[in-house]
From Swiss-Prot:
This is Elongation factor Ts. Belongs to the EF-Ts family. CDD domains: UBA_EF-Ts. Its main location: cytoplasm. Associates with the EF-Tu.GDP complex and induces the exchange of GDP to GTP. It remains bound to the aminoacyl-tRNA.EF-Tu.GTP complex up to the GTP hydrolysis stage on the ribosome. One of its GO terms (cellular component) is cytoplasm. Keywords: Cytoplasm, Elongation factor, Protein biosynthesis. It comes from Shewanella halifaxensis (strain HAW-EB4). The lineage of its organism: Bacteria, Pseudomonadati, Pseudomonadota, Gammaproteobacteria, Alteromonadales. The keyword Thylakoid does not apply. It comes from the Bacteria. One of its GO terms (molecular function) is translation elongation factor activity. The keyword Thylakoid does not apply. Pfam families: EF_TS.
Length: 283
């Protein structure tokens, strides 16, 4: 039977798929739209399963504040081009809205949005991954996003402007802890052993090496903690100095950056696409 433009339009509206894909699906089902949708969903799931092996290290960090807390979400794709795509961002924001409404776990988010994710993978042609969701509590919260790639929320006792500036500092300086005293003992001991070994390799006697390491460890714990770092807006002062001057404090912070911790392959996505086109041409 002949497939009409109205049928193709209806299938496109309901699935978001391309015109040629819709026409092909309708032709295969003799114009049965419901069967075409079922077949496209099955095909989409298969395509998504194949894409799942592709590394998704680009994407976006999104933030949404609720009553006394904030949610930070990372959703990944394969290229920065798709990271700016309206369909990708709409999906990410939909996930964030659900997460922020009731502090949903990452496992439940993945399960709830799996069908939508699969449909998006089919439409966009890249692997999409809802990677992580973090929550931070606090009566006073300030957030900062550096583009779509870095997101920070800071909780503390301070005015909004001060907390916003601290959030900007966290985005730039990547502290791991709030205070030097928060650095775990095992981290301190590991660094201390390393510094002693370095000092002794420099030819220093053991007792001298031990004394040298005291100063180095103070520097180390300061560099990895927020209040011990030089404040980016006033480098001659530490963040701790600034907070003390303002009678303020920071209780917690969360910093997320797109793709951190994901091992990337050397080959780029463009090369992968070229290889797929070449394989198609040979077929």
């Amino acid at each position: 039977m002949a497939i009409t433009a109205a049928q193709v339009k209806e299938l496109r509206d309901r699935t978001g798929a391309g015109m040629m894909d819709c026409k092909k699906a309708l032709t295969e089902t003799n114009g049965d739209i419901e069967l075409a949708i079922d077949n496209m969903r099955k095909s989409g799931a298969a395509k998504a399963a194949k894409k799942a092996g592709n590394i998704a290290a680009e994407g976006a960090i999104l933030i949404k504040q609720g009553e006394g807390y904030a949610a930070l979400l990372e959703v990944n794709c394969q290229t920065d081009f798709v990271a700016k795509d309206s369909n990708f961002l709409a999906f990410a924001n939909e996930v964030l809205d659900v997460a922020a409404a009731s502090k949903v776990t990452i496992e439940d988010l993945k399960a709830q949005f799996e069908e939508t994710r699969v449909a998006l993978v089919t439409k966009i042609g890249e692997n999409i991954n809802v990677r992580r969701i973090e929550y931070i509590d606090g009566a006073n919260l300030a957030q900062y996003r550096h583009g779509e790639r870095i997101g920070v929320v800071v909780a503390g006792e301070a005015d909004e402007e001060t907390l916003k500036h601290i959030a900007m500092h966290v985005a730039a300086s990547k502290p791991e802890y709030v205070n030097p005293s928060d650095v775990p003992a095992e981290v301190v001991e590991k660094e201390k052993a390393l510094q002693i070994e370095i000092a002794m390799n420099e030819g220093k006697p053991a007792e001298i090496a031990e004394k040298m390491v005291i100063g180095r460890m103070k520097k180390f714990t300061g560099e990895v903690s927020l209040t011990g770092q030089a404040f980016i807006m006033e480098p001659k002062k530490t963040v701790g100095d600034i907070l003390k001057e303002k009678g303020a404090s920071v209780t917690n912070f969360i910093r997320l950056e797109v793709g951190e911790g994901i091992e990337r392959k050397e080959e780029d996505f463009a090369a992968e696409v070229a290889a797929q086109i070449a394989a198609t041409n040979k077929a």
